Amino acid sequence: MSPTAEESLSFSCRIARTENECSRYFSLRREIFCAEQGLFASDDRDAWDGLATPIVCLVASPRDNPDAMPRLAGVVRIWEEAPGDWWGGRLGVAAEFRTAAVVGRRLIQHAVGTARAWGARRFRATVQKPNVAFFRRLRWDSIGQLELLGRPHDLMEACLDRYVPTDEIRGIPGIAGQVAAKGTTGKGERSSAELSGRDAA
C-alpha cells in the first residue's frame, strides 16, 4: 500500500474489549514478534498480559460493505508497574500498513494519552534500535541502552505534556487477561526475574 493510500484510510484506536478483538490482537502479535521477527519461538504472551490493557488500531469498514469486520492495523499494550509509573510494549503494525507510519503514530498517541488520562506521571518503553528515531520524532527521550532477546534497545521515556489524555474508561483487566492466560503455560511465559517492566518490543 502506498503512503498516500494509507493516509486516506480512516483509522481509529481503542482498547480491545471483546474476545474477538483480543484474539485478533494476540494473533497479530504472534505474526509480528514470532513468525516475522523471531523474537519468540511460537508465542509472545507473558505474565504482563494479565495486567496490561490491550489497544488496537482498526481500519474503518468500506462504505460499500459497512457490515464487514474492521481490519486490524496494529497493536500495543500498556500497564502500570507502580502507582503513576506506566510502561508500553508489544507495539506492532501489520505489514500492509507500514508505509506512512500513520498506524504506529496513532497507537503511541493513544497508548500514552490513555495512560496519562489514568494518572501516569511517567511512561517508558524499551524500543528496538531501528525505531528509536521514530520515537524521538514523537517527543520521546532515550534514557539508557540495553540488550533484550539478543537485540539492542533504547530505554525511552515519553514527554507526557506532549500527549493529549484520551477519554478511555479504566476497567479491571478481564477478557484480555483470560485470552492471554490460555497461552502463558509454556514458551510464552517469562520468569519473575525478567518481569522488570522492560518489554522486548
Residues covered by each model-derived region:
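Terminal substrate-recognition subdomain of acyl/acetyltransferases
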Residues: 1-14, 65, 116-117, 129-201
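Short alpha-helical
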Residues: 20, 83, 129-133
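Active-site rim helix/loop that mediates acceptor-substrate recognition in acyltransferases
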Residues: 30-67
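Short acidic/glycine-enriched loop/turn segments that link adjacent beta-strands
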Residues: 51, 84, 149-153
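Short, high-confidence coil segments that cap the C-terminus of an alpha-helix
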Residues: 52, 118-120
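Conserved beta-strand in the GNAT
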Residues: 56, 65-80, 84-92
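Conserved hydrophobic beta-strand within the GNAT/NAT acetyltransferase core sheet
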Residues: 88, 123-127
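Conserved acetyl-CoA-binding loop-helix of GNAT-fold acetyltransferases
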Residues: 93, 99-113
